[in-house]
Amino acid sequence: MTRSHNHSATLTTPDFDQARAEAAVRELLIAVGEDPDREGLLDTPARVARSYREIFAGLYTDPDEVLTTMFDEQHDEMVLVKDIPMYSTCEHHLVSFHGVAHVGYIPGVDGRVTGLSKLARVVDLYAKRPQVQERLTSQIADALMRKLDPRGAIVVIEAEHLCMAMRGIRKPGAVTTTSAVRGQFKTDKASRAEALDLILRK
């Protein structure tokens, strides 16, 4: 099987190795001084492996495939979906970062739009893999530009990182905000300001 080192790519085929993941979790329990054979931990390796398969499910689906459905609505104004719940995993510590994503675009000259649920699905697929927030934000925006051919795209993610909250600097409640702007949102200050006003308005 071929793997790509391009972070925007996906694996060619699903290849989650349940047995190997279980063995790794068992070894980790031993490494921290636990007894993986005690009652409370007997099924933990299998449970953790199954949860990782779900948490990293985005590795096995190409997000571009989600954006193939288009509708001819002759719409030429911004489409924005706010407050999409988002859960991802910090690739540096393999703990969660979670928050909300705001995703918007201005349809291209053909006025075609995609389904609103597709925007949320793209967020999920890029989030469900080892990530950093900056790359996640850019990947979503780039996917919109690549597949929808819009005049512009904007993505803002606000998230709390448990690697900052529960370890290290230990600052629970700190929120990291990242943005990616493309096309008209990057070149036209008025369009960008309108989008950010809508995103920040509660």
UniProtKB/Swiss-Prot annotation:
Zn(2+) binds at C90, H93, C163. Pathway: Cofactor biosynthesis; 7,8-dihydroneopterin triphosphate biosynthesis; 7,8-dihydroneopterin triphosphate from GTP: step 1/1. GO terms for biological process: one-carbon metabolic process; tetrahydrobiopterin biosynthetic process; tetrahydrofolate biosynthetic process. The keyword Nucleotide-binding applies. It catalyses: GTP + H2O = 7,8-dihydroneopterin 3'-triphosphate + formate + H(+). GO terms for cellular component: cytoplasm. HAMAP family: FolE (MF_00223). PANTHER family: GTP CYCLOHYDROLASE 1 (PTHR11109:SF7), GTP CYCLOHYDROLASE I (PTHR11109). This is GTP cyclohydrolase 1. The gene is folE.
